[in-house]
UniProtKB/Swiss-Prot annotation:
PROSITE patterns registered for this protein in UniProt: RIBOSOMAL_S6
Protein's organism: Prochlorococcus marinus (strain MIT 9313)
Family under the similarity heading: Belongs to the bacterial ribosomal protein bS6 family.
Keywords: Ribonucleoprotein, Ribosomal protein, RNA-binding, rRNA-binding
Name the record gives this protein: Small ribosomal subunit protein bS6
Lineage summary: Bacteria, Bacillati, Cyanobacteriota, Cyanophyceae, Synechococcales
Length: 124
């Protein structure tokens, strides 16, 4: 019995679009994957970075990584939407075999047990 593959899609948005529009694109692509019957595992904003070479006269781009699993049909839907978008300057989807990656814990999202103990000691 083989495990269901998961996919990682990295896409680069134009650097000159406003932050609200970036969030709109991220939400749109995440919902597209969900509507296609797949599950979004992780969505990371990598931020604005310098490109290795100019793409469409841009030297920088806003990088976004989307990890998802499903039967593969969501990839065609997602890539078609990205291909037609003028705000996406590059995209790449890679199929990963094997176990799903562990969920990413964002630093600062959960208090450390040591910090809780120190806070209790200060209050006492």
């Amino acid at each position: 019995m083989s495990q269901q593959p998961y996919y990682e899609t990295m896409y680069i948005l134009r650097p000159d679009i406003p932050e609200e529009e970036v969030e709109t694109h991220v939400t749109k692509y995440r919902e597209m994957v969900t509507e296609a019957g797949a599950e979004v595992l992780d969505n990371q904003m990598r931020g604005k970075r310098r490109l290795a070479y100019p793409i469409s006269n841009h030297k920088e781009g806003i990088y976004v990584q989307l990890s998802h699993n499903g039967n593969g049909q969501q990839v065609a839907v997602l890539e078609k939407a990205m291909r037609l978008s003028e705000d996406v300057i590059r995209y790449l989807t890679v199929k990963q075999e094997g176990p799903l990656p562990a969920p990413r814990i964002v630093p600062g999202s959960e208090p450390e047990p040591v910090q809780q103990q120190e806070a209790a000691a200060v209050e006492a």
